[in-house]
A protein has these predicted regions:
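Acidic-and-aromatic substrate-binding clefts and catalytic sites of carbohydrate-active enzymes
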Residues: 31-34, 182-188
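Aromatic-lined carbohydrate-recognition surfaces of secreted/lumenal glycan-active proteins
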Residues: 53, 61, 185, 200-223
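Short catalytic-loop micro-motif centered on adjacent basic/acidic residues
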Residues: 53, 176-180
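Substrate-binding/active-site clefts of carbohydrate-active enzymes
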Residues: 3-167, 171-172, 192-197, 222
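Short, surface-exposed helix-loop/turn micro-motifs enriched in polar/charged residues
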Residues: 17, 48-49, 178, 207-210
């Protein structure tokens, strides 16, 4: 099923009704229903002998930031980024918020971006769209369809995403994940996201097993 997470509703001429423009990974989007309805859906599916596979995104959030050219050290004056409509800026038509609601991404605001934050403490790749699909670094660190690309090589991001997606297993009893845009995330991310056995921060497959789902399913989209 499509991602049920709370999303950016719209930006400019496009809309996030489909569930792939996350704003908060642990809330149900109002137009999808409620958590209780989702729980009932999974329960009824199981009673009919069906598995429920939830679609998820670990590559990007919504389109809150417009980045037309990769941000570089030259874009900072006295330690602060020079916001420019020709290069990078916060999307003014984002609805209902101008930035994600969830940490850590809510901490980064391109309008207040400092050099130190960009260089050492950013949870976004402040780069333009993918330009070379034969270059893995370009694919992993640039945006797909202009959607804000997460720094999935960050341990902070990796640890939080594991927890955010254990949440749905715990709350609803789903049977697996179909991982959207998996081709644009470095393979090392998935080793921990899926298989980590640390009891304090399990990967999603291991967590599924701990909940009695020996066959918890994970597979990715690649195109």
């Amino acid at each position: 099923m499509t991602p049920p997470v709370k999303c950016q509703v719209a930006e400019s001429n496009y809309h996030g009704y489909h569930g792939y423009w996350a704003s908060d990974f642990t809330k149900v989007d109002p137009h999808m229903g409620t958590l209780q309805q989702y729980q009932n859906f999974v329960k009824e599916a199981h009673e009919k002998g069906l598995y429920v596979i939830q679609d998820i995104v670990v590559n990007h959030l919504g389109d809150y930031q417009q980045i037309k050219k990769d941000i570089s050290a030259n874009d900072f004056v006295e330690g602060k980024a020079k916001v420019s409509e020709s290069r990078f800026y916060l999307e003014p038509k984002s609805v209902p918020f101008s930035h994600p609601e969830q940490l850590p991404w809510a901490l980064n605001n391109i309008n207040d971006l400092t050099y130190d934050e960009w260089k050492h403490n950013s949870f976004y790749h402040y780069n333009s769209e993918i330009s070379d699909y034969t270059n893995q670094t370009n694919m992993y660190t640039h945006s797909s369809s202009n959607l804000d690309d997460m720094v999935t090589e960050s341990e902070v991001v990796r640890n939080l995403l594991r927890g955010y997606f254990r949440y749905w297993i715990d709350k609803t009893g789903i049977d697996g994940y179909r991982i959207d845009t998996a081709l644009y995330v470095e393979p090392e991310f998935f080793e921990g996201f899926i298989n980590a056995t640390d009891a304090s921060n399990m990967g999603v497959r291991e967590y599924g097993k701990s909940k009695g789902k020996a066959d918890f399913i994970d597979f990715g989209e690649a195109f």
